[in-house]
């Protein structure tokens, strides 16, 4: 199981606050760019919750109607990273990682391409030990064992579900452990 913040799905406009404040409301749509479109908001109190809930549930993001919200516990990360596994065309799955997460990965790859780490994953054996060590070094990971376990879980999620993309942005370091703070 990949560690994530405590969360609750809201599909009803009459729903009451599901957890103590503050928490984050996230539009549930099958597209990226939710934050830029106003589909991710912090709720500090009940008034903000009601305003943001109504606004986001009435939203359309990139031609996708919002039908649900994820209320998620606010988590303070010491660091934020980026991690994804993607399948493009007929090539092997590719892991993409960056020690700067929580941002637009396309912008980072344009402005500072040396920060992006890309490596192919053998679909039969997964990442090799030397690849994991290299990745941990490039991402400046302190707890390497936690990182190796986390990467293994992400690989299994990708391969076991037949996904074309698993993206974690940001991948947070919270209390010394890795946590998927947002994903698709």
Q: Model-predicted segments: where are they?
A:
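Hydrophobic alpha-helical hairpins/lids featuring a short glycine-rich hinge
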Residues: 62-120
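Glycine-rich phosphate-binding loop of ATP-grasp-fold ATP-dependent ligases
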Residues: 5-7, 25-52, 82, 104-108, ...
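Terminal amphipathic helices with adjacent charged low-complexity linkers/tails
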Residues: 172-184
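ATP-dependent carboxylate/phosphate-activation module, predominantly the ATP-grasp catalytic core
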Residues: 38, 94-143, 184
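A conserved helix-loop-beta module that forms one wall/lid of the active-site cleft
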Residues: 1-21, 27
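Catalytic core of tubulin tyrosine ligase-like
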Residues: 51, 55-62, 135
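A long amphipathic alpha-helix within ATP-dependent nucleotide-binding catalytic cores
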Residues: 131-171
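ATP-grasp fold ATP-binding core
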Residues: 19-35, 62-78, 83, 154-158, ...
């Amino acid at each position: 199981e990949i560690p994530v913040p405590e969360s609750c799905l809201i599909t009803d406009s009459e729903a009451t606050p599901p957890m103590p404040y503050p928490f984050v409301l996230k539009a549930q749509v099958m597209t990226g760019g939710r934050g830029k479109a106003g589909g991710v908001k912090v709720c500090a109190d009940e008034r903000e919750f009601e305003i943001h809930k109504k606004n986001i549930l009435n939203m359309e993001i990139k031609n996708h109607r919002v039908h649900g919200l994820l209320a998620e516990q606010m988590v303070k990360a010491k660091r934020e990273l980026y991690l994804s596994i993607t399948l493009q065309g007929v090539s092997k799955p590719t892991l993409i990682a960056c020690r700067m997460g929580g941002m637009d990965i396309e912008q980072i790859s344009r402005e500072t391409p040396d920060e992006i780490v890309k490596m192919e994953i053998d679909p039969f054996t997964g990442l090799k030990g030397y690849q994991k060590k290299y990745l941990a070094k490039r991402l400046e990971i302190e707890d390497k064992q936690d990182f190796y376990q986390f990467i293994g879980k992400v690989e299994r999620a990708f391969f076991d579900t037949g996904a074309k993309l698993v993206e974690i942005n940001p991948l947070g370091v919270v209390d010394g452990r890795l946590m998927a703070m947002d994903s698709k």
